[in-house]
Amino acid sequence: MRSFQISAVFPHLTVLENVRIALQRRRGSSLDFWRSDRVLHELDERAQELIDAVGLSSFVGSTAGELPYGRKRALEIATTLALDPEMMLLDEPTAGMTHEDVERIAALIRKVAANRTVLMVEHNLSVVSTLSDQITVLARGEVLAEGDYQSVSTNPKVVEAYLGTAHG
């Protein structure tokens, strides 16, 4: 599982090195920088597959710190996928992104959700409406509504909590 609001990449390492470290962790040898190049390069094929899957092929040699914000989120998804989780926790994965990056990350989330459960906290309603099968709306620690987007978005308690009585 991984949360997004704090960047979780090594900014001075390349995209490939970041994913390779995550793969090392999966093998039980995380952050083993002293391994031979041969041993580390054994991970490169799978690392490249993950990099391709998240659309970062053209950034493989770039350091993570050089990546645009949305591409860093894609790298975080790649490093998470390297661990082959059954569930991913995404905390506002599109916060602060441009429209183009939101679309790219939403498509990527849709793709990875096909093979695992994704639990997402998100305030961008267009992202919620396109990605979510089941929605739970919380306000002040209380569950206001649960269901699909249509039923939740028209629920009077949800409308009141998020839009106020003038919109009801």
Predicted feature residues:
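Glycine-rich phosphate-binding loops of nucleotide-dependent enzymes
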Residues: M1-G168
